[in-house]
C-alpha cells in the first residue's frame, strides 16, 4: 500500500504582498509621531508641525516662516469674514517709521509747578511745591491766609530766598548779617543767619515764571543803547558811600532782577542780551557713531511662527483679507566689529535677541481664531565671554 505525501501549497504573490503591506503599516505606526489630540480627541490637522518638531519651511535658528506648507488659506478667510468688523480693528500692521526719526530732542519747556502737579484731592489745598530745605538747614513753611496765589501781599520778604541769595553775591554786604534771635542785623563777622521761626518766603508763581522767561524788552531797544548800557561802568565808590551814610539801616532785599542770572539762563537755554557775552560750549560727543554688531531690518508677514510655549502655529496672514506685518532685525554677521584688542582668553560674538509679539493665529483644531505671543528677532548684541 502506497502512502501519498502531501506537499504544502506554494505561497502566492498576493499573500506575499499582503504580508509586506501589514509589516509596513506596523513599522510606520510605531515610528510616526504621536497624535496631537488629547483625551481621545481627533488629531490636530491645522498645525505647521506636530508639537516638539520644526516645520520644513523654517531654517535652523529661525522662529517663523513667511511661506508655510499646506497653509489653510480658505479656512482662515472664512473665519476672518465670520469675525466681521472686528478683523479690521484687531489686525494692525507695524509701521515703517523709526523712533529716532520721530522723537523730539529739544529742551523741554518749564512750566509752573501747579500745572505740572495737579492736586489729587479737589478739596485739598493747592500744591505749592516741595518742602525743600533752605541752604542754611531750615525747613520753609507754607504761607497762611487766602488771596490770589499768583501775587504776594507783601512784596518784600524778611528772609532771602535761595535764588535771591545766590544772585546777590552771598546775601550780605559790608559785613552785615541777619540775627537768628531778633531778626536784626549786626556788623560783626561775615556769616549769615536767618530767622527760621516764621520768616519763610511764600510761594509766588509770578517769581517762578519770571526766573525762566527771557527779558524781551531789551530786544526792542536800539543796538547802540544796549551796547552803551552794557559797557557803562558802575560807580562802586558812590554805592559804598551811600551804605556808610546809613549804617543802622536794615539790610534791604537785593533788587537785582533774578531773570538776569546767567547761570540759570544758560541751563535753560535762553540767549544772552548781548551777543558778545554769549559763551560757546564745546561738544564732547564724537560726531560719528559705530555699531558693534551690524543688523539687517526687514518687515515680514509670517504664515507660521513659534509661540511662547514652544509650539508652531499658523498665523493669520492673507494678503487680500487679513495681514499682520511685523518688523524683524537680524544679525548680519557673527563677529563684533570696531572692538579693541581683547585680553587673552576672551572672545566676542554677535548674539541674536528675540522679543514676543502678540498676533492672531489659527487654533490647532481649526475651529476658531485666537491671540497668541510669538518669538521674533529684535536686535543683535555683542557679548564678550571667556574661551
Swiss-Prot record:
Domain spans labelled Spaetzle: 291-384
InterPro entries: Cystine-knot_cytokine, Spaetzle, Spz/Toll_ligand-like
GO molecular function, one term: growth factor activity
Start and end residues of each stretch annotated as Disordered: 133-197, 219-256, 269-291
Biased composition (Basic residues): 276-286
Tissues in which the protein is found: Detected in the fan-shaped body which is a component of the locomotion center in the central nervous system (CNS) (at protein level).
Cystine crosslinks: 293-350, 331-380, 340-382
Keywords: Disulfide bond, Glycoprotein, Signal
Bias-annotated ranges (Acidic residues): 237-247
GO cellular component: extracellular region; extracellular space
Keyword Translocase: no
Name of the protein in its database record: Protein spaetzle 5
Name of the coding gene: spz5
Amino acid at each position: 500500500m502506497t502512502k501519498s505525501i502531501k506537499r504544502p501549497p506554494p505561497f502566492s504573490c498576493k499573500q506575499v504582498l499582503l504580508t509586506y503591506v501589514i509589516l509596513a503599516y506596523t513599522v510606520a505606526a510605531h515610528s510616526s509621531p504621536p497624535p496631537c489630540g488629547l483625551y481621545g480627541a481627533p488629531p490636530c490637522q491645522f498645525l505647521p508641525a506636530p508639537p516638539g518638531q520644526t516645520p520644513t519651511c523654517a531654517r535652523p535658528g529661525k522662529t517663523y516662516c513667511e511661506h508655510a506648507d499646506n497653509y489653510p488659506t480658505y479656512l482662515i478667510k472664512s473665519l476672518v469674514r465670520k469675525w466681521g468688523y472686528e478683523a479690521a480693528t484687531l489686525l494692525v500692521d507695524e509701521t515703517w517709521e523709526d523712533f529716532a526719526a520721530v522723537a523730539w530732542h529739544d529742551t523741554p519747556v518749564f512750566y509752573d509747578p501747579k500745572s505740572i502737579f495737579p492736586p489729587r484731592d479737589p478739596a485739598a489745598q493747592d500744591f505749592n511745591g516741595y518742602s525743600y530745605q533752605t541752604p542754611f538747614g531750615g525747613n520753609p513753611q507754607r504761607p497762611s491766609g487766602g488771596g490770589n496765589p499768583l501775587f504776594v501781599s507783601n512784596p518784600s520778604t524778611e528772609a532771602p530766598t535761595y535764588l535771591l541769595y545766590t544772585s546777590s553775591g552771598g546775601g550780605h554786604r559790608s559785613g552785615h548779617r541777619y540775627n537768628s534771635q531778633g531778626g536784626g542785623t549786626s556788623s560783626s563777622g561775615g556769616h549769615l543767619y536767618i530767622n527760621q521761626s516764621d520768616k519763610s518766603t511764600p510761594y509766588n508763581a509770578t517769581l517762578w515764571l519770571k526766573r525762566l522767561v527771557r527779558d524781551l524788552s531789551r530786544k526792542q531797544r536800539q543796538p547802540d543803547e544796549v551796547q552803551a548800557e552794557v559797557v557803562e561802568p558802575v560807580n562802586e565808590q558812590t554805592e559804598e558811600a551811600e551804605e556808610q551814610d546809613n549804617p543802622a539801616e536794615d539790610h534791604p532785599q537785593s533788587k537785582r532782577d533774578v531773570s538776569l542770572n546767567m547761570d540759570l539762563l544758560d541751563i535753560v537755554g535762553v540767549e544772552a542780551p548781548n551777543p558778545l557775552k554769549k559763551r560757546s560750549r564745546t561738544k564732547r560727543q564724537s560726531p560719528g557713531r559705530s555699531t558693534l554688531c551690524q543688523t539687517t531690518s526687514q518687515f515680514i508677514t509670517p504664515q507660521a511662527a513659534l509661540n511662547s510655549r514652544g509650539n508652531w502655529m499658523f498665523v493669520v496672514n492673507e494678503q487680500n483679507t487679513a495681514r499682520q506685518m511685523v518688523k524683524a532685525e537680524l544679525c548680519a554677521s557673527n563677529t563684533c566689529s570696531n572692538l579693541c584688542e581683547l585680553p587673552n582668553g576672551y572672545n566676542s560674538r554677535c548674539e541674536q535677541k528675540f522679543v514676543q509679539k502678540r498676533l492672531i493665529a489659527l487654533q490647532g483644531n481649526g475651529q476658531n481664531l485666537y491671540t497668541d505671543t510669538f518669538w521674533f528677532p529684535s536686535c543683535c548684541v555683542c557679548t564678550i565671554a571667556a574661551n
